[in-house]
Amino acid sequence: MAGRKGGERKKAVTRSVKAGLQFPVGRIGRYLKKGRYAQAVGSGAPVYLAAVLEYLAAEVLELAGNAAKDNKKTRIIPRHLLLAVRNDQELGRLLAGVTIAHGGVIPNINSVLLPKKAAGAAEKESTKSPKKKAATKSPKKKTAATKE
């Protein structure tokens, strides 16, 4: 007969594997249903949401890894996450209301508070007349004492 009673079972293929994702499609689908966001949840919604979340996570981790490398570190810490998110215009706007614990602050010094000698020195150099060449010394004349 056509039944498979004693045969080997096929290994289950998850929806995450079918979609080529690392994030769990089944778990996200379960959360969507349990959260009562809508009366029904389509079969493609958890796949799409998992793909979006995976993309955002990859983007943040890549930028945080670059920030860690810039600081000569091999481990990503919350400070690197904050620097990555706040220095990226789109992610900064998306996560504008988010506080990252132990992230610190973005370094920023108001331009009014910066010393003016760098700008002042450049202006002084341009207003000064061109420097004259230093006079070269003529060779010493031999005197009676040096002739001996």
UniProtKB/Swiss-Prot annotation:
<dbReference type="GO" id="GO:0000786">
    <property type="term" value="C:nucleosome"/>
</dbReference>
<protein>
    <recommendedName>
        <fullName>Protein H2A.6</fullName>
    </recommendedName>
</protein>
<dbReference type="Pfam" id="PF00125">
    <property type="entry name" value="Histone"/>
</dbReference>
<dbReference type="GO" id="GO:0005634">
    <property type="term" value="C:nucleus"/>
</dbReference>
<dbReference type="InterPro" id="IPR009072">
    <property type="entry name" value="Histone-fold"/>
</dbReference>
<feature type="short sequence motif" description="SPKK motif 1">
    <location>
        <begin position="129"/>
        <end position="132"/>
    </location>
</feature>
<dbReference type="GO" id="GO:0046982">
    <property type="term" value="F:protein heterodimerization activity"/>
</dbReference>
<dbReference type="GO" id="GO:0031507">
    <property type="term" value="P:heterochromatin formation"/>
</dbReference>
<keyword id="KW-0158">Chromosome</keyword>
<keyword id="KW-0238">DNA-binding</keyword>
<feature type="compositionally biased region" description="Basic residues">
    <location>
        <begin position="129"/>
        <end position="148"/>
    </location>
</feature>
<dbReference type="InterPro" id="IPR032458">
    <property type="entry name" value="Histone_H2A_CS"/>
</dbReference>
<dbReference type="InterPro" id="IPR032454">
    <property type="entry name" value="Histone_H2A_C"/>
</dbReference>
<comment type="function">
    <text>Core component of nucleosome. Nucleosomes wrap and compact DNA into chromatin, limiting DNA accessibility to the cellular machineries which require DNA as a template. Histones thereby play a central role in transcription regulation, DNA repair, DNA replication and chromosomal stability. DNA accessibility is regulated via a complex set of post-translational modifications of histones, also called histone code, and nucleosome remodeling.</text>
</comment>
<comment type="subunit">
    <text>The nucleosome is a histone octamer containing two molecules each of H2A, H2B, H3 and H4 assembled in one H3-H4 heterotetramer and two H2A-H2B heterodimers. The octamer wraps approximately 147 bp of DNA.</text>
</comment>
<dbReference type="GO" id="GO:0030527">
    <property type="term" value="F:structural constituent of chromatin"/>
</dbReference>
<keyword id="KW-0544">Nucleosome core</keyword>
<keyword id="KW-0539">Nucleus</keyword>
<feature type="short sequence motif" description="SPKK motif 2">
    <location>
        <begin position="138"/>
        <end position="141"/>
    </location>
</feature>
<dbReference type="Pfam" id="PF16211">
    <property type="entry name" value="Histone_H2A_C"/>
</dbReference>
<dbReference type="InterPro" id="IPR002119">
    <property type="entry name" value="Histone_H2A"/>
</dbReference>
<feature type="region of interest" description="Disordered">
    <location>
        <begin position="120"/>
        <end position="148"/>
    </location>
</feature>
<dbReference type="GO" id="GO:0003677">
    <property type="term" value="F:DNA binding"/>
</dbReference>
<dbReference type="InterPro" id="IPR007125">
    <property type="entry name" value="Histone_H2A/H2B/H3"/>
</dbReference>
<comment type="similarity">
    <text>Belongs to the histone H2A family.</text>
</comment>
